[in-house]
Regions:
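Flexible loop/turn connectors
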Residues: 2-89
Length: 89
C-alpha cells in the first residue's frame, strides 16, 4: 500500500540506504496524495484505477453469485506510471 511504501522509504533513508542505487521502492495507488512530493526521494507510483477495479470485481461477483455466464473472465484496466526518484527507471 501507499503508506507501507512511504514507511519503507523513510526507514531505509534513516538507515543510510541509498535510494534508488541500493534499493528501489515503488508503490501502487493514486498520485493525488500530496505527501508523495514531500518525500525525499520522491516515491514512484503505479497509479491504478481503484474505483473501476472495484466496480468490475463487484459486477463479476454479482454474475457468479447469480449463476450467470460471465461475458469475460479477464478485464484490462489502464494504469499510469508516475516516476519519482525512488526508482532508477
Amino acid at each position: 500500500s501507499d503508506y507501507i511504501a512511504m514507511g519503507l522509504l523513510c526507514g531505509l533513508v534513516d538507515r543510510g540506504v541509498k535510494i534508488p542505487e541500493q534499493v528501489e521502492v515503488i508503490s501502487t495507488g493514486t498520485s493525488d496524495i500530496d505527501i508523495y512530493q514531500c518525500l525525499r526521494p520522491s516515491l514512484s507510483i503505479v497509479e491504478v484505477p481503484l474505483e473501476k477495479m472495484a466496480y468490475q470485481c463487484a459486477r463479476m461477483l454479482h454474475a457468479i453469485i447469480n449463476h450467470e455466464v460471465l461475458s469475460e473472465r479477464e478485464v484490462n484496466l489502464p494504469f499510469r506510471l508516475c516516476l519519482g526518484n525512488s526508482t532508477l527507471g
